[in-house]
Amino acid sequence: MTENRYELNKNLAQMLKGGVIMDVQNPEQARIAEAAGAAAVMALERIPADIRAAGGVSRMSDPKMIKEIQEAVSIPVMAKVRIGHFVEAQILEAIEIDYIDESEVLSPADDRFHVDKKEFQVPFVCGAKDLGEALRRIAEGASMIRTKGEPGTGDIVQAVRHMRMMNQEIRRIQNLREDELYVAAKDLQVPVELVQYVHEHGKLPVVNFAAGGVATPADAALMMQLGAEGVFVGSGIFKSGDPVKRASAIVKAVTNFRNPQILAQISEDLGEAMVGINENEIQILMAERGK
């Protein structure tokens, strides 16, 4: 990938800013997401809650199923590959997917190395729970970062923790002297140019979304107020009592995240939220994958 192409990919990801990206399992769900105002959909055979419940090895979704979703909607379609599985990424690029998510939700294919994202033309999304992880993924060619949260739980606590951690570390970098940035880059194991960008601009060089545990409009607005530039919603919509209404409400919450009156209004009568799992009741499986 050329430098110009990478800049284009980062700009493509910027176009999703202020939007909601929803996990969908079939064309019908994709159409519901599009009608609700989703900025993009994530095509996958099993949503995180089902992956967690079933256990075993989880892999890239069937390309035929992804293509059916691509044909059903006009908004961008994303799909997940396993961490380090560059052949799954090659397959998704071959079917002209709009974005690839190198995701800790699936079972890692490589426990040491991530995909070299600069070998691809398509933009990549990656998860991160702190500034070091985020900048390492960006150094590999990621065009978009999201918090990891703990997918499939409906518990927002980890996404909040990751976003706050990233914000704190960004502020720490901003407070360093210019000549201290080289040591910071060494500690974070990233090129100094990325640390210099954070120092100067007070944010990541790419768009930063929230993901993991978003189940209500209030959750989505919370992440936006903490500094997220958009929200991924996985199990929270289609594991709820009224997916159509909840999808629309979460989109409105992201748009109006600083307006409590609107948030109160759209939070009414949504039906039952997905059954959540407290982080103290489970083993943290996914958020720790891929550092």
Swiss-Prot record:
It catalyses: aldehydo-D-ribose 5-phosphate + D-glyceraldehyde 3-phosphate + L-glutamine = pyridoxal 5'-phosphate + L-glutamate + phosphate + 3 H2O + H(+). The active site is at residue 80. GO terms for biological process: amino acid metabolic process; pyridoxal phosphate biosynthetic process; pyridoxine biosynthetic process. InterPro entries: Aldolase_TIM, PdxS/SNZ, PdxS/SNZ_N, RibuloseP-bd_barrel. Its EC number is 4.3.3.6. The keyword Protein biosynthesis does not apply. Pfam families: SOR_SNZ. D-ribose 5-phosphate binds at residues 23, 152, 213, 234-235. Pathway: Cofactor biosynthesis; pyridoxal 5'-phosphate biosynthesis. GO terms for molecular function: amine-lyase activity; pyridoxal 5'-phosphate synthase (glutamine hydrolysing) activity. SUPFAM superfamilies: Ribulose-phoshate binding barrel. PROSITE patterns: PDXS_SNZ_1, PDXS_SNZ_2. Keywords: Lyase, Pyridoxal phosphate, Schiff base. D-glyceraldehyde 3-phosphate binds at residue 164. Belongs to the PdxS/SNZ family. In the presence of PdxT, forms a dodecamer of heterodimers. HAMAP family: PdxS (MF_01824). Catalyzes the formation of pyridoxal 5'-phosphate from ribose 5-phosphate (RBP), glyceraldehyde 3-phosphate (G3P) and ammonia. The ammonia is provided by the PdxT subunit. Can also use ribulose 5-phosphate and dihydroxyacetone phosphate as substrates, resulting from enzyme-catalyzed isomerization of RBP and G3P, respectively. This is Pyridoxal 5'-phosphate synthase subunit PdxS. The lineage of its organism: Bacteria, Bacillati, Bacillota, Bacilli, Lactobacillales. The gene is pdxS.
